[in-house]
């Protein structure tokens, strides 16, 4: 029975090309049961068979169906497209220029200054109200508390938790075309689950995968010394 339970082929990764560099059986994972009795041997074989079933199920879940097990160039539709991390830039602040922008520009929040007379009061005081398109109706005590940039805010005003002397611009870049070719380490782990190859030497030699031969060359995509 032990011969019917193969040792899985563990894939290795070729980082420069983003391809699988072949696979080999890892005999270090085999349990030594040479001096064990029939009961222990049966338990060991049960563990090995259960491990292989888990690997076969995992491969069925995460492996992308494809004709070529280890394609030389993965199409863009099958490659994970990773978005680069955003870049944050701190911009200088110019309070006077921002106030002028607030008073003369169209904006979604904030506004310009005008003097109004409150009911029951004989004095004129400064209030700030939005001009043009305004989605909020908040008042602030000082025009310096307004943030025309607002870190892309749509409503609200005032200093809140923002630093009035600091403005932050976030830049997000992306590729103009989807990437193709090699795959990354995360996708490699999902695509190349340890392979369970039953009866590897029972068929014709030409049917044995080149990737399982020890001297397989990932660059040449062939095994040295084999036609």
UniProtKB/Swiss-Prot annotation:
<dbReference type="GO" id="GO:0019028">
    <property type="term" value="C:viral capsid"/>
</dbReference>
<dbReference type="GO" id="GO:0042025">
    <property type="term" value="C:host cell nucleus"/>
</dbReference>
<protein>
    <recommendedName>
        <fullName>Pre-hexon-linking protein VIII</fullName>
    </recommendedName>
</protein>
<keyword id="KW-0167">Capsid protein</keyword>
<comment type="similarity">
    <text>Belongs to the adenoviridae hexon-linking protein family.</text>
</comment>
<feature type="site" description="Cleavage; by viral protease">
    <location>
        <begin position="111"/>
        <end position="112"/>
    </location>
</feature>
<feature type="modified residue" description="Phosphothreonine; by host">
    <location>
        <position position="64"/>
    </location>
</feature>
<feature type="modified residue" description="Phosphoserine; by host">
    <location>
        <position position="118"/>
    </location>
</feature>
<keyword id="KW-0597">Phosphoprotein</keyword>
<feature type="site" description="Cleavage; by viral protease">
    <location>
        <begin position="157"/>
        <end position="158"/>
    </location>
</feature>
<keyword id="KW-0426">Late protein</keyword>
<keyword id="KW-0946">Virion</keyword>
<dbReference type="Pfam" id="PF01310">
    <property type="entry name" value="Adeno_PVIII"/>
</dbReference>
<comment type="subunit">
    <text>Interacts with the peripentonal hexons as well as the hexons in the facets. Part of a complex composed of the core-capsid bridging protein, the endosome lysis protein VI and the hexon-linking protein VIII; these interactions bridge the virus core to the capsid.</text>
</comment>
<dbReference type="InterPro" id="IPR000646">
    <property type="entry name" value="Adeno_PVIII"/>
</dbReference>
<dbReference type="GO" id="GO:0031423">
    <property type="term" value="F:hexon binding"/>
</dbReference>
<feature type="propeptide">
    <location>
        <begin position="112"/>
        <end position="157"/>
    </location>
</feature>
<keyword id="KW-1048">Host nucleus</keyword>
<feature type="modified residue" description="Phosphoserine; by host">
    <location>
        <position position="174"/>
    </location>
</feature>
């Amino acid at each position: 029975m032990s011969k019917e339970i193969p040792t899985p082929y563990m894939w290795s990764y070729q980082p420069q090309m983003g391809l699988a560099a072949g696979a080999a059986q890892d005999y270090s994972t085999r349990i030594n049961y040479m001096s064990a009795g029939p009961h222990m041997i049966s338990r060991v074989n049960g563990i090995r068979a259960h491990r292989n079933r888990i690997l076969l199920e995992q491969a069925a879940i995460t492996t992308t169906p494809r004709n070529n097990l280890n394609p030389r160039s993965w199409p863009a539709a099958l490659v994970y497209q990773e978005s680069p991390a955003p870049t944050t830039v701190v911009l200088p602040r110019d309070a006077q220029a921002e106030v002028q922008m607030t008073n003369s520009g169209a904006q979604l929040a904030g506004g310009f200054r005008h003097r109004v007379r409150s009911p029951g009061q004989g004095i004129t005081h400064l209030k700030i109200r939005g001009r043009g398109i305004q989605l909020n109706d908040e008042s602030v005590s000082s025009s310096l508390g307004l943030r025309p940039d607002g870190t892309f805010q749509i409503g609200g005003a005032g200093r809140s938790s923002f630093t009035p002397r600091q403005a932050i611009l976030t830049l997000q870049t992306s590729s103009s075309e989807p990437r193709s070719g090699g795959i990354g380490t995360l996708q490699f782990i999902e695509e190349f689950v340890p392979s369970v190859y039953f009866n590897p030497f029972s068929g014709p030699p030409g049917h044995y995968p080149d990737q399982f031969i020890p001297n397989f060359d990932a660059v040449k995509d062939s095994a040295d010394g084999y036609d």
